[in-house]
Amino acid sequence: LTPAVAKADGVDYIVMPGWKIFMIQFLNIAGTGPIFGAIMGAWYGPVAYLWIVFGCIFAGAVHDYLSGMLSMRHGGVGLPELVGKYLGNTTKNVMLVFSVLLLVMVGVVFVYSPAIILEGIYGSRMWWIVAIFIYYIIATMLPIDKIIGKIYPLFAFSLLFMAFALLIGFFVKLPDIPELWSNLSDCNYNDNTAWLGTDSFMTKNPIFPCLFITIACGAISGFHATQSPLMARCVKHEKMGRPIFYGAMITEGV
């Protein structure tokens, strides 16, 4: 039995439809990071495409799937508890502090960035920051199917609609997209160092490691390991794990 069935409590452990879990998982991991990161990563040219595609398939989606299934197999526990089980309490406490600090920083970004965008539509920036914080608190305190289970799928649908609209726009406008070999056709160690990150923008931001930091959430992100267990508590059958956890990350990459 999955935790949603064996430990059902009507709050965190609740069986929900697979499509709804997928949409919530997708929105949990596809925030401002993959959007702004990919835009900034475009400075690196075609190599950014490769990192997003191969990073998602072989790293990010595998990471999300494993973190979700590990949590499911261990009663729906969070990341620090999983670390503590296999690496001891000391490592668990270190991971707990580390996770809290990173989640605080991620939370600040996820509050401040929407507030800046919404400020131009209505109200002040501080007004939106307070409103978003109030929403977060209410959504956290209520059972997961009351607010998150009802609103998140709508937000996720909006994000997917935006992505498909952009895809249609590409086919309608047919903008120029640089080919992979346009920057790499004559690269070699001795004569051309552009691919190592020594020209223009990349002079101070070499491909390694800056590209992998700039486009992190869009290809692989350890932050997702804190989100997958939340949905692992709502899955009815283990066979739903791959389309939900692996599939949500692939969708984010797309």
Give the residues covered by each predicted segment:
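Selective recognition of specific alpha-helical transmembrane segments in multi-pass small-molecule
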Residues: 99, 103-107, 139, 156-172, ...
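Membrane-interface "cap" regions at the ends of multi-pass membrane proteins
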Residues: 1-35, 237-240
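Select transmembrane alpha-helical segments in multipass membrane proteins
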Residues: 14-25, 89-102, 200-215, 254
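Hydrophobic, small-residue-rich membrane helices and short re-entrant helix-turn-helix hairpins
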Residues: 79, 142-156, 223-254
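Flexible loop linkers connecting adjacent transmembrane helices
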Residues: 1-14, 38-41, 46, 62-91, ...
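Transmembrane helix-bundle signature of multi-pass membrane transporters/permeases
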Residues: 53-60, 215, 245-253
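Hydrophobic alpha-helical segments and their helix-loop junctions in multi-pass secondary transporters
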Residues: 107-111, 115-130, 139-140, 159-196
